[in-house]
């Protein structure tokens, strides 16, 4: 059942008594989600199993052989059989009513007595819901991957051993690590350089620091000869000194992050400016990029305010909430 109210969209999905559900993307602290309240929101510090995480998804699968995908970039709450509406309440057993809780844990424990998943999508005036059938959970996940586009198959080295050097690393220290690993026969496929490889961070210039890496092309050639792939750490907030800053000004949001522009990647122009510049780094010998700190400020602390707010506006018409999620 889907209902549109002044608040937004409310969705109800039936749950059987012996039904378990799993999902919501990358979740560190919970696996079986029945009886929980989940908010799969992009965030840099997953805490307490609430659903805040680096890679959330508004998708879950059921042991009954189906999956539910709520196709939205809005902050969405899933009550996974944790709450019961008045008209469907079950009569408590007499012995339960007589029980007196004597601890905080007992008093407020989750009794998992709901028979529906209640999905709350505030601000939505309509919603697209995909019901994906199995019959098995594995079949559901396979079909979800086909529906969502699947993604590319990573190269074998991308599944190998990685080592990242500290943010204050230099060309000489990187080569010392590289030589040490090979001399000691310590497996290492990828060397990651934290954002200190740039002239400015945070926000990012995307320009090599001549002070720390005076001959970076020579270093990349040497690392390639030793069998290393090189991964650069960065984020998408563009420093005033960046060569792409001016070009991105018309295609960025109305809030800064660390004095850096926030590109509106919904717009093809912003996407092209950003990727074209990064293609020059790939041509130099870089094999990949790690997008650090692109997953929102820690929403668990009032002092964590560095990221753009949910009310930010972007030229494409998207707001900050949706931009965080996409």
How would you describe each model-predicted region?
Residues 55-57, 64-66, 117, 125-128, ...:
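Structural beta-strand/beta-sheet cores of well-ordered domains, especially the beta-sheet scaffolds
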């Amino acid at each position: 059942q889907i209902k549109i109210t002044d608040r937004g969209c409310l969705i109800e999905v039936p749950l059987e008594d012996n039904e378990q559900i799993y999902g919501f993307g990358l979740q560190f602290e919970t696996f079986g989600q029945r009886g929980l309240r989940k908010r799969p929101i992009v965030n840099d510090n997953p805490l307490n199993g609430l659903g805040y995480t680096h890679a959330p998804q508004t998708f879950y699968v059921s042991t009954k052989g189906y999956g539910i995908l709520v196709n939205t970039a809005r902050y969405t709450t899933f009550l996974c059989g944790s709450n019961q509406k008045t008209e469907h309440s079950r009569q408590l057993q007499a012995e339960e009513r007589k029980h007196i809780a004597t601890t905080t844990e007992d008093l407020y424990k989750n009794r998992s007595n709901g028979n529906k998943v209640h999905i709350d999508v505030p601000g939505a005036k309509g919603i697209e819901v995909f019901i994906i059938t199995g019959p098995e959970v594995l079949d559901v996940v396979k079909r979800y991957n086909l529906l969502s586009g699947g993604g590319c198959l990573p190269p074998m080295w991308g599944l190998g051993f990685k080592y990242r050097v500290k943010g204050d690393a230099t060309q000489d220290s990187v080569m010392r690590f590289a030589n040490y690993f090979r001399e000691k026969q310590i497996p290492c496929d990828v060397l990651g350089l934290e954002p200190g490889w740039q002239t400015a961070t945070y926000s990012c210039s995307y320009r090599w620091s001549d002070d720390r890496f005076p001959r970076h092309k020579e270093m990349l050639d040497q690392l390639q000869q030793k069998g290393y792939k090189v991964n650069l750490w960065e984020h998408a907030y563009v420093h005033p000194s960046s060569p792409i800053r001016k070009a991105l000004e018309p295609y960025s949001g109305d809030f800064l992050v660390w004095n850096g522009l926030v590109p509106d990647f919904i717009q093809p122009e912003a996407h092209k400016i950003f990727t074209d510049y990064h293609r020059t780094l790939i041509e130099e010998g870089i094999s990949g990029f790690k997008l650090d700190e692109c997953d929102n400020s820690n929403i668990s602390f009032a002092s964590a305010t560095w990221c753009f707010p949910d009310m930010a506006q972007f030229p494409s018409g998207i707001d900050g909430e949706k931009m965080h999620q996409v």
